[in-house]
Design a protein with these regions (language model features):
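Hydrophobic alpha-helical segments, especially transmembrane helices
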Residues: 3-4, 157, 356
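Outer membrane beta-barrel
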Residues: 54-74, 86-215, 224-255, 336-338, ...
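Outer-membrane beta-barrel transmembrane strands
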Residues: 190-212, 216, 220, 294-309, ...
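Alpha-helix capping and helix-loop boundary segments enriched in small/acidic/polar residues
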Residues: 184, 221-222, 407-408
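N-terminal periplasmic/intermembrane-space "pro-region" immediately following the signal or transit peptide
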Residues: 2-68, 114, 139-142
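Outer-membrane beta-barrel proteins
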Residues: 74-78, 120-122, 141, 161-166, ...
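Outer-membrane beta-barrel pore domains
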Residues: 27-38, 83-84, 129-132, 246-254, ...
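Acidic/histidine-rich helix-loop elements
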Residues: 78-86
Length: 424
């Protein structure tokens, strides 16, 4: 009886938090140019569209934000029986501050600050970038035909490798993730980068370069090589008819350095979305448990992403492989994921679905095979375009390849989460 009361109290608290915030986030939509709306309208938007959907009259600053609150009821265990006890309660709320500024016709600035995060309780700048869709600030009509299909992006921010990063939770911006956790191998990093995107008649092409560094520094030592990271994407995205949309992309990322290019699966400074899990009674806790980072140097990664939407049915998949060089051990990991959703209601404001995610491979050739599986089942309700509440059951298992004295040996965590979100 007490457990049921806890659940009811938690649900009431989360719902009350949402409805109190909904007054300030009623279907807000900006008229910024070439912009992905930070609302339900931004669902299933990947690269920013090449339709302006706004006119430039003067410099315009749009201040927005994200807020996410969780109730977590997860248990964990391992073969050593040396993990901390977990209860059912509210996690630390997370919040983002978003500043988007239209500087000129076709010239826009984005800046995001994590006001509160699992990994940083204090305010912490995630990154920012400038997006250029017109070059009229150089000269009216400059390269006009090219810029009708091209977007130039430069900054210190997340770069466009793969499609999964468009659907992930970015600290408190959880609106586009139908579940609570991100994928086990979470391909996301913020680095100094520049990229060019071409979109024409459904064709998508991206080519870009980063400096391969998450933490910037000009200090060098005997191991510094400062190798650049190169990445790209080719794909096709078409609304075939009113009911059917098809998208298929393939992306690659490559860095031959020893001191750079190691952050592709460890670049998120917000922290994972599951709290307290797999924390040993002795030893330091990690804010990133539940994820897996190969920590490869001289890596090459490839990610293939199918996306299909037919009426309310939606499928998104990941086929991904990352490997390092022969000198570094010739290791390799493969990630597979499939996410199936059914969106329903007059505006598809409700959804139900499931996700299966697995990572397997080895750190060095002929080494012990590691295998991790996760299942998510849940659903959500968009109370308005800017307000979402979601419920999930999840189960993650560390299946193979962990040493007898590792806390991951026989490891498992499973349970229920309620997550409430406001984004505007």
């Amino acid at each position: 009886m007490k457990k049921h009361l806890t659940w009811l109290s938690a649900g009431a608290f989360v719902l009350a938090s949402l409805t109190s915030g909904a007054v300030f986030a009623q279907d807000q939509e900006t008229d910024l140019q070439y912009f992905r709306q930070n609302s339900k309208e931004g669902l299933n938007v990947f690269e920013t569209p090449k339709e302006a959907k706004g006119t430039f009259e003067k410099v315009k600053v749009v201040v927005g934000g994200d807020f996410a609150l969780q109730f977590q009821s997860i248990n964990h265990s391992n073969a050593l029986n040396n993990l901390v006890d977990l209860g059912s309660n509210i996690n630390l709320p997370t919040a983002n501050l978003n500043i988007n500024t239209q500087l000129a016709d076709g010239l826009r600035l984005h800046l995001r600050t994590y006001l509160s995060a699992k990994h940083h309780n204090e305010a912490w700048v995630k990154g920012g970038h400038m997006q250029i869709d017109k070059l009229d600030f150089i000269k009216p009509g400059f390269l006009e035909e090219f810029m009708k299909v091209a977007t130039i992006t430069v900054g210190m921010d997340e770069f466009n490798y793969g499609d999964a990063h468009f659907r992930r939770s970015d600290n408190a911006r959880v609106l586009f993730n139908p579940f609570v956790g991100n994928y086990i191998m979470d391909s996301f990093s913020t680095e100094a980068f520049g990229e060019v995107t071409i979109q024409s008649n459904g064709f998508i092409g991206v080519v870009g370069v980063t400096n391969g560094k998450l933490n910037q520094s000009v200090v060098v030592n005997s191991t510094t090589d400062n190798k650049l990271s190169f990445y790209g994407k080719l794909g096709f995205d078409k609304q075939i008819n009113e009911d059917f949309r098809f998208r298929l992309t393939g992306s690659w990322y490559m860095n031959n350095g020893l001191s750079t290019g190691t952050y592709l699966y460890g670049g998120d400074r917000g922290g994972s979305r599951y709290y307290g899990i797999m924390q040993a009674l002795e030893g330091t806790a990690s804010d990133f448990e539940g994820r897996f980072n190969p920590r490869f140097k001289q890596m090459t990664a490839i990610q293939i992403n199918p996306f299909i939407k037919f009426k309310g049915l939606e499928f998104f998949g990941i086929i991904e492989n990352v490997g390092n060089s022969e000198d570094q051990g010739n290791g390799s990991f493969t990630q597979l994921a499939g996410e199936a959703l059914y969106r329903f209601g007059t505006t598809e404001q409700f959804y139900l679905g499931g996700r299966y995610n697995t990572v397997s491979g080895n750190s060095v050739e002929n080494g012990d095979d590691i295998k991790i599986n996760r299942v998510n089942i849940g659903g959500g309700w968009f109370m308005t375009n800017n307000v979402l509440i979601k419920l999930e059951y999840m189960n993650q298992q560390y299946k193979e390849g962990f040493a007898a004295d590792s806390k991951y040996n026989g490891g498992e965590f499973k349970g229920v989460n309620i997550e409430a979100a406001i984004s505007f």
